[in-house]
């Protein structure tokens, strides 16, 4: 992949496996898919960067960049953007691990192509995850019009006999939303993370589970990359090569995105509840 892809793995609370998912996804893409990966650990605990350091590989560079949050200050935002720009410069894929706090504006999420939000399958956690994502979408509607960002929910620490309960129905209306294969709750999994990346451990259940998750995310990354390349090619084809006229009209992304809007259909109860979400962000 020549075009850089930036992934943010975030949630508002701990205990859902965010850092271990970040470290293991970085290892999977770097080793299994042979890409240069940069892992940026924005959490003070430095868990994900520590895990990557224990299982070092030449394709992975990890950086610890704990943020100092200052209320009503833009300094944190500037520091976060600067760290992302600096540490992603030479990577094919950048993965940022960040526990979200409202000391950081939602604008920072726009620096990323993919958002991955880990969540347990408890009713409270599912509701919290849905609210977190929908608030972000609602507050950033205009910017999301011009950025085809992918939102993935990663069910984490899920018992295999509860897979049917993993539903995020409040997000199904979003066009670029998908739910990842769940990360299972396995008794030995926390011990294995200290030994090696999950996809390489001897425990077949753990390794196959991580490969399924990693392959799904990588497929979405490839899909997004191809979409960006197609859009770039379309823009280049529409703009006259030999045109040097100063008043030549500028073609914007919205000219193309507007074509994808669907005709309004009779609203269901779910559509009425989320009527604030415009057609260009809704799943067709």
Question: Where are the language model's segments positioned?
Answer:
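Histidine-centered active-site loop/cap adjacent to the catalytic His
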Residues: 202-228
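Extreme N-terminal, non-catalytic leader segments
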Residues: 1-10
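Inter-motif core of Ras-like GTPase G domains
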Residues: 105-123
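Conserved C-terminal guanine-recognition region of P-loop GTPase G domains, centered on the G4
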Residues: 129-145
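Long, low-complexity, intrinsically disordered segments
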Residues: 252-284
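Beta-strand-loop-alpha "switch" segments that mediate conformational coupling across diverse proteins
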Residues: 157-202
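P-loop/Walker-type NTP enzyme "switch/lid" segment
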Residues: 10-12, 16, 25, 31-95, ...
